[in-house]
Amino acid sequence: MPAPIHERPADLLTELIRFETVNPPGNERACVEYVDGLLTEAGIATETLAADPERPNLLARLPGGDAPPLLLQGHVDVVPTDGQEWDEPPFSGARRDGFVWGRGALDM
């Protein structure tokens, strides 16, 4: 049985890069469902909101204490790769020389 995903951050990054969420059109649903599953598996309460079913937003809440709340925000859509040269396919999540390669690997 593999180690929990939080113990394998490079594996998580590779999996996220493999989702082709180019915007337009976005199509982030599969990626959001994947992240939702990981959070749910970890016991974190989630909620999905969507004006467009293919572009949902995922909310996750962790119970806190007396400190002020903290909001972390991110995105899973990426810009197109048309006309660009890549050393590795942009949605492969390839690993080479100690790095994970792919569209979106650095801008989260």
Report each predicted region and the residues it spans.
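Acidic/His- and Gly-rich active-site-bordering loop/insert found
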Residues: 2-107
